[in-house]
Amino acid sequence: MSTKHRIRDKYRIELREKDHLPPHVHLTGAGVDVQISLETGVVMLGKAPKAVLEEALAWVAAHRAELLEEWNLWHP
């Protein structure tokens, strides 16, 4: 597991080495576990406070290429 970004010192965007398809990241912390698709940029599973989710989705969109590159290294 690799923490890629922190939001408000309570939440983390994580890329997990041993994870299932499709490519995605997890938004975790403060009782939240949301899966965000790297292919579509939308929430696959879970819920989070609106402002936190908006910030996470914007960060994932801005870093999508590098996240997908790392995902593909871990999941050849």
Where are these regions (language model features)?
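C-terminal structural segments of small proteins and small subunits
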Residues: 49-76
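Short, solvent-exposed secondary-structure boundary motifs
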Residues: 3-6, 25-27
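Charge-dense, helix-prone N-terminal extensions
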Residues: 2, 10-13
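Hydrophobic N-terminal alpha-helices or hydrophobic patches in metabolic proteins across all domains
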Residues: 5-8, 58-59
